[in-house]
Amino acid sequence: MPVIKVRENESFDVALRRFKRSCEKAGLLAEVRAREFYEKPTTIRKREKASLAKRHAKRNFRENARNTRLY
């Protein structure tokens, strides 16, 4: 849990903004969304495998585009 200390003469808005930024860096919102509903282990594996395939396809596309001459 991110903790911030409110500095002297710091407005509430600035402190709230710093807290939100620290929560975002810690990945709290993503974690809450991921744990909101139960996800079966097979579904998790399937989603991760699809993500891996997408990453590889994107990398291959970039490598091929880099080697292709446009003239």
Curated annotation (Swiss-Prot):
GO biological process per UniProt: translation
GO CC annotation: ribonucleoprotein complex; ribosome
Annotated keywords: Ribonucleoprotein, Ribosomal protein
Residues covered by region (Disordered): 48-71
GO molecular function, one term: structural constituent of ribosome
Domain of life: Bacteria
Residue ranges with Basic and acidic residues bias: 60-71
Family: Belongs to the bacterial ribosomal protein bS21 family.
NCBIfam families: S21p
Protein name (Swiss-Prot/TrEMBL): Small ribosomal subunit protein bS21
Gene that specifies this protein: rpsU
